[in-house]
Structure formats: C-alpha cells, structure tokens
Amino acid sequence: MDLKSNIKLILATDLLAVLILSLFIKNFKMVLAFLLAVFVIWLFIDKNNINERLYENLLAMSVGFIEGILIFLGIIYNEVFLDITLGIFAILILIVMGILFPKYKLIFEVFDEFVEHLKQKSGFLTLISIFGMLLTIYVFLLILPSKEFCINAVDIIRTIMLVITANMFIIEFYTFKKFS
C-alpha cells in the first residue's frame, strides 16, 4: 500500500477506537471532536506529495492516541492506576536525568550525542507518541466530573505535555540548524 492508504488505515483504526470508547462511556461528543480532527488531517494527506516523515509522525501520534484510550479506561475503573502511572513516570524521569545528565555542566557536552541518539532510535517518534497519549488522557480527564484526582492529574499531565513539546521543538530546531 502507498503512504496515503496507510495513513487512511491509521485514521480508520483511530476512529474505530473512538467509536468503541464512545459507546462504552455513552458520550458521543468525542466522536464529533475526533471527526473534526480527522478532517483537518485529511487536508494534509490529500496533497500529492506525502512524505515519509508525515506518515511516521501520524503513526506515532496514533499509537499514543490508542495508548491514551487504554490508560483512560484504566483510570476510570481503578483510581489506584493513576497513582501507579505517576510513580512510573517519576521513576523514569529520575532514571533518564540520572543517566543522561549526571552533572549539570555536562549537559552541553552530552547534547550532541543525545540528539543523535534520539534521531537514530526514533526517540522523536517516541516523544510524539507519548504526547498523543498524554493529550488523549488530558482530554478525557476534562470530560469526567470534577474530582480531586482528575484535577491533580490534569495539572501534572499539562506540565509533562509542555515539557515534551518544548523538547520536540528544541530537537527539531537543533537538528535543522545543525544540518542546514
């Protein structure tokens, strides 16, 4: 299949996931919001020159979207799941900070290798996937009635999303500047 067909298959899979979730929690506003997002994406994929990068980014976002739906269902049916998820995020952040940046003065020396490693190991796509997952959880938590754990989770997820977005822009700007 060509790239356009692959992208349309990804969007169809995401739409199916949204329909199942909407039927499950009986909230059909999400389907309308997702159809609007699909319409905006469709404007990009109807062009003649679809590149591999757009396809990879959309695929990573789609994987994150489906992961977000699964985690959202876990949060609804088990509030302890949220605490476990936050604990895992905190441990991962500590591990990454401890391994990559053991001392603050080494950050600039490590940055070149860090960016190269991200590009080679599809780390950028991983960031996009995580961003899609967090965005999905964020939107679904806003739909829930205001509970204490939802408000705290929304604040934490918003912060993580801002950090990931800043990192993606830094990586893209850095590699664009380096190779241009």
From Swiss-Prot:
Protein's UniProt name: Uncharacterized protein MJ0271
Q: Which positions, given as ranges, span the membrane? A: 4-24, 25-45, 57-77, 81-101, 124-144, 156-176
Q: Which cysteines are joined by disulfide bonds?
A: none
Name the GO cellular-component terms.
Answer: plasma membrane
Q: Which domain of life is it from?
A: Archaea
Enumerate the subcellular locations listed in this protein's record, separating them with semicolons: Cell membrane
State the membrane topology.
Multi-pass membrane protein
The entry's keywords: Cell membrane, Membrane, Transmembrane, Transmembrane helix
